[in-house]
Amino acid sequence: MSELSTLARPYAEAVFRMAQDENDLAGWSSRVTTLATIVSDTQVARLIADPAVPADRVAELIVSVAGDGLGERGANFVKVLSANDRLTLLPEISTQFETLKAGAEGTLEATITSAQELSQAQVDDLVAGLKAKFQRAVNVQVAVDPELIGGAVIMIGDQVIDGSVKGRLQRMAFALQG
C-alpha cells in the first residue's frame, strides 16, 4: 500500500496544484472522484490490465465514460496516467487529493470506528472534542467493528487514538510479556 501511496503522490500533488491554480478544488475533486470510480469498475479494470488494448484506447474510453465535465485538462490527465501505466492509481490519487484539499480548506478527515453503532449525539460529541483538540473543522466517517469489544478508535490524519477495549487488552498483554 505504501508503494501505491508513493507512486500516486506526485500525480495527486500535480492535480491539486492545477486545481488551486484554476481556483476549482471542488470541481477537480469531483473529476478525480469520478475517474477513480470509473477505473474501480471491474470491466474497466480488466480492460486496463489487458496488454492487447492500447493505452490510448483505454484513455479514450475512460474520457468518454467520464463525460464532458472532465474537460480538456482532465482528459489530458487521463492520457498521461494511461501512457505511464498509472490508471490503477486513480483511487489512491483521489484519496490523496481529498487529503490535500481538506488541508487547504482547513479541515481534517477522521474515521471513527466503534464497537457498536454510535448515536448522532455521540458522534457530535466526538467531533466537538476533535475540533477542540485540533483547532480545525473535522469531517468524519463512522464505522462499526464489533472486534473492538468496546470503545472506539479514531484515525485522524496520521494519528490514531485507540480507546478500544481490544487496544487496551493488547497493550496490557504487551506490558505483561515485557
Curated annotation (Swiss-Prot):
User: Which InterPro entries does the record cross-reference, listed alphabetically?
Assistant: ATP_synth_OSCP/delta_N_sf (IPR026015), ATPase_OSCP/dsu (IPR000711)
Gene Ontology molecular function, alphabetical? proton-transporting ATP synthase activity, rotational mechanism
GO terms under cellular component: plasma membrane; proton-transporting ATP synthase complex
SUPFAM superfamilies xrefs: N-terminal domain of the delta subunit of the F1F0-ATP synthase (SSF47928)
Keyword list (alphabetical) reads:
ATP synthesis, Cell inner membrane, Cell membrane, CF(1), Hydrogen ion transport, Ion transport, Membrane, Transport
Tell me which Pfam families the record gives.
OSCP
Q: How does it sit in the membrane?
A: Peripheral membrane protein
Where does the record say this protein resides?
Cell inner membrane
Function noted in UniProt? F(1)F(0) ATP synthase produces ATP from ADP in the presence of a proton or sodium gradient. F-type ATPases consist of two structural domains, F(1) containing the extramembraneous catalytic core and F(0) containing the membrane proton channel, linked together by a central stalk and a peripheral stalk. During catalysis, ATP synthesis in the catalytic domain of F(1) is coupled via a rotary mechanism of the central stalk subunits to proton translocation.
Question: What does the sequence similarity comment in the record state about its family?
Answer: Belongs to the ATPase delta chain family.
Q: Which NCBIfam families match?
A: ATP_synt_delta, PRK05758.2-2
Q: What interactions and quaternary structure are annotated?
A: F-type ATPases have 2 components, F(1) - the catalytic core - and F(0) - the membrane proton channel. F(1) has five subunits: alpha(3), beta(3), gamma(1), delta(1), epsilon(1). F(0) has three main subunits: a(1), b(2) and c(10-14). The alpha and beta chains form an alternating ring which encloses part of the gamma chain. F(1) is attached to F(0) by a central stalk formed by the gamma and epsilon chains, while a peripheral stalk is formed by the delta and b chains.
Q: What is this protein called?
A: ATP synthase subunit delta
